[in-house]
C-alpha cells in the first residue's frame, strides 16, 4: 500500500495541467482606458551593465523598455539599438521610440496587429545574444546576455506577443 502512494506521488506531476510560465500583469490606463499587459521590470546584469527590461503591450503597440539602473545613460530620439541574434549574422537596427532623457530609459516598439510584424517575429524566432546601443555623441553601450538571460528575454517577448492579440479590437 505504501508503494502505491509513493508511485502515485511521483506520477502526479505528469497528470497535472502544465504551468504557464507567463506571469503577466494587466492594468488599465487611467487616461485612454485601454488595457495594457506587461511583464513588469525584470533585472538583468550583463558584462557589468545593470538594467531592467520590461515588455508591454497595448491594443496599438508592443513596447520593449530597457532601463539602465546603475549608470544613468542619456538617450534621445536619434539613439539606436542594434539587436544581435544567437548563431546568426542578421542584425536588427531600431530607433529609440522614447523621449529624450538622462535617466537610462530606452524604448523600441512594434505595431500590435493580427499579423506579427516581421522584425518582431525575428525576435520570437531567434534568441537575442546582445544589444549595442548608440546614444548621443556616439556613446556606445554593449550588453551581452548569458544563456539564462537569453532564454528569459525570449520567454518574456513570446508571452507578451501571444497575449497581445487578445487586446486587439474585433
Please report, for each region that a protein language model flagged, where it lies by residue.
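Mid-length scaffold segments of soluble, non-membrane domains
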Residues: 70-94
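Bacterial Sec-dependent N-terminal signal peptides
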Residues: 1-24
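Internal interaction segment
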Residues: 88-170
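Secretory-pathway extracellular proteins and peptide precursors enriched for disulfide-bonded cysteines
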Residues: 14-19, 64-66, 92-94, 148-152
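Short, surface-exposed loop motifs enriched in S/T, G, D/E and P with embedded aromatic residues
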Residues: 20-35, 87-98, 142
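Secretory pathway export signals and precursors
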Residues: 18-19, 70, 98, 155
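An ectodomain-focused feature that recognizes extracytoplasmic/extracellular
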Residues: 19-77
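Residue-level detector of beta-strand face positions
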Residues: 43, 80-84, 130-132
Amino acid at each position: 500500500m505504501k508503494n502505491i502512494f509513493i508511485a502515485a506521488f511521483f506520477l502526479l506531476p505528469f497528470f497535472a495541467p502544465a504551468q504557464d510560465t507567463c506571469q503577466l500583469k494587466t492594468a488599465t490606463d487611467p487616461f485612454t482606458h485601454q488595457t495594457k499587459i506587461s511583464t513588469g521590470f525584470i533585472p538583468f546584469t550583463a558584462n557589468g551593465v545593470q538594467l531592467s527590461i520590461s515588455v508591454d503591450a497595448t491594443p496599438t503597440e508592443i513596447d520593449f523598455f530597457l532601463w539602465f539602473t546603475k549608470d544613468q545613460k542619456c538617450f534621445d530620439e536619434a539613439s539606436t539599438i542594434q539587436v544581435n541574434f544567437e548563431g546568426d549574422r542578421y542584425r536588427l537596427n531600431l530607433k529609440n521610440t522614447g523621449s529624450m532623457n538622462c535617466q537610462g530609459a530606452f524604448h523600441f516598439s512594434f505595431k500590435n496587429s493580427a499579423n506579427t510584424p516581421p522584425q518582431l517575429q525575428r525576435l520570437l524566432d531567434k534568441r537575442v545574444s546582445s544589444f549595442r546601443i548608440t546614444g548621443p555623441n556616439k556613446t556606445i553601450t554593449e550588453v551581452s546576455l548569458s544563456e539564462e538571460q537569453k532564454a528569459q528575454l525570449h520567454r518574456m517577448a513570446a508571452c507578451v506577443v501571444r497575449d497581445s492579440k487578445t487586446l486587439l479590437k474585433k
